């Protein structure tokens, strides 16, 4: 686990928290105690141990329960579970930042993505500022 590679003096770490069943994200994020979380989408990738997308959404929402108070969660506004996840976050006093490829009013709007064999270029709008990566 990459968490064991984090040194005491490190100011931040980017950690992926995976899951195969309900409770796994909760257990891992109790250890990590994140300031910031990202849920990219709710999809059938984890369906083998769940009965529905609702179950997957509930399991992924476990990260929100362990974000420090006043922390942040970044959510995909294009996902059908956006409002479900946002509601949980707001109840926990977690700031929600949205991203979208469809809704130009989201906090982070993905205007265009260009890919080829050697690189990827992403054009995003954050508030009124357009950036290219």
Per-range role (PLM):
Residues 6-7, 32, 67:
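A generic alpha-to-beta junction signature in SAM-dependent methyltransferases
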Residues 6, 21-24, 60-63:
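Helical "lid/switch" subdomain of P-loop NTPase nucleotide-binding domains
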Residues 10-22:
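Switch II (G3) loop of P-loop NTPases
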Residues 1-5:
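N-terminal phosphate/diphosphate-binding loop that engages ATP/GTP or pyrophosphate donors
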Residues 8-11, 70:
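Short acidic/histidine-rich motifs immediately flanking catalytic phosphotransfer sites
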Residues 20-32:
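Switch II of P-loop NTPase G domains
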Residues 35-133:
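Acidic, Mg2+-coordinating active-site environments of NTP-dependent enzymes
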């Amino acid at each position: 686990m990459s968490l064991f590679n984090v040194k005491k003096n490190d100011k931040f770490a980017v950690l992926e928290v995976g899951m195969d069943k309900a409770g796994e994200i909760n257990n891992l994020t109790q250890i990590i105690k994140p300031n910031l979380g990202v849920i990219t989408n709710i999809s059938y990738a984890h369906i083998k141990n769940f009965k529905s997308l609702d179950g997957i959404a509930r399991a992924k929402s476990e990260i929100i329960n362990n974000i420090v108070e006043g922390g942040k969660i970044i959510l995909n506004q294009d996902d059908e579970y956006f409002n479900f996840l946002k509601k949980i976050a707001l109840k926990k006093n977690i700031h929600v930042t949205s991203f979208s490829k469809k809704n130009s009013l989201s906090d982070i709007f993905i205007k265009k993505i260009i890919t080829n064999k050697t690189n990827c270029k992403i054009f995003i709008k954050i508030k009124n500022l357009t950036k290219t990566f």
